[in-house]
Regions:
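Alpha-helical scaffold/interaction cores of sigma-54-like transcription cofactors
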Residues: 1-327
């Protein structure tokens, strides 16, 4: 983080780290948690069965600078990226088994394009017959059998999106390591779950394309205004009601987190007017609240069309900010 700050690389802490005053004081995050009334306990709770996890996003276009800084500071012997195990999915399994058995690539492509895996009423084993592969053929039988066996089986190792392991000792004394396909990178041959089981500390150095866009926007603004524009500067300005007027009209194309069609559909109905309203807005357009039928009750209560009630008085303090609806 200090390296990024010194080199004017935009970054931001994500997740529950934003609840931490310490992270704010260290400038890992830019929002004062006292201003937004978050739960400190979520980050430092004794009930957690693992150490606090701090994920940091860096500009997508400059993350490699941060990665190489970590390697140069700690050495490639003591620093490496975690691996991700890539497993066979149906298409890759079907294609590779088919090629090994001598089927033409054009035939395999045709079958893959015409199989509907979402159709649970017709098994894929039956669908391939409609594509000209008869299950009476011994080679087709072998193809079906082998595909069924290797779907879900590990295919190859890839690099984790940003999970770094930093050790006091050379990593090769603790875990198997290898050089990555990308130059100047080292990869541990185990995934993050294996590393957590061993108790090795993983630090996530993540990339976010929107931070690159924000930095470019700051550069344009700084050409026009004497006050240097930055994320901390903007967060100190507080809520801008003209911006919220645009948000309520779903004028949010290119706006991080609220630019999807689903978000833009809900924005005029929820009508966010402050930061916490946006927190609810982003959270409510997710599978959990949608499948749990929590969207409509919240909207009705927010606009006074339904009375606010609580399952129990014991949860009132927890659910009061979301009007009795368990969105989070």
């Amino acid at each position: 983080v200090q390296f990024a700050r010194d080199n004017r690389i935009l970054y931001q802490g994500r997740g529950s780290a934003a609840n931490s005053v310490v992270c704010y004081c260290l400038e890992i995050t830019a929002v004062d948690p006292r201003q937004i009334n978050v739960l400190f306990e979520r980050f430092i709770s004794k009930e957690r069965d693992e150490p606090p996890d701090i994920d940091v996003d860096f500009e997508h276009s400059r993350r490699e600078e941060v990665i190489q800084y970590i390697y140069s500071k700690y050495g490639r012997e003591r620093t490496a990226l975690a691996a991700t195990v890539i497993s066979f999915r149906f298409k890759s399994a079907f294609r590779e088994v088919g090629k090994a058995l001598g089927f033409a690539e054009s035939q395999l492509d045709y079958v893959i394009k015409n199989i509907n895996r979402r159709d649970r009423t017709v098994p894929w084993q039956t669908q391939i017959e409609n594509c000209g592969l008869s299950s009476a053929n011994s080679k087709v039988k072998q193809l079906i059998s082998l595909v069924e066996q290797i779907v879900g089986f590990p295919r190859h190792l890839s690099q984790h999106v940003g999970g770094f392991v930093i050790s006091a000792k050379p990593l090769y004394e603790l875990v198997p390591v290898e050089n990555a396909a990308m130059s100047e990178r080292t990869v541990i041959q185990w995934d993050k779950d294996d590393l957590e089981t061993l108790g090795l500390l993983k630090v996530d150095v993540l990339a976010l394309g929107m931070l690159t866009a924000i930095r470019k926007a700051f550069a344009l603004l700084n050409e026009q205004y004497p006050q240097e524009v930055s994320i901390p500067f903007i967060t100190r300005l507080g809520d801008d009601q003209q911006v919220y007027d645009m948000i309520c009209e779903a004028d949010t194309v290119g706006t991080f987190q609220i630019e999807s069609r689903a978000q833009m559909t809900i924005l005029p109905r929820l009508k966010p007017r402050c930061y916490y309203d946006l927190v609810v807005q982003i959270a409510i357009v997710r599978p959990g609240p949608i499948q749990g039928d929590m969207v409509h009750p919240y909207l009705l209560r927010r606009h006074g069309r339904e009375s606010v009630s609580y399952p129990s008085e014991e949860v009132k303090s927890v659910l009061s900010r979301t009007m009795g609806v368990p969105i989070f």
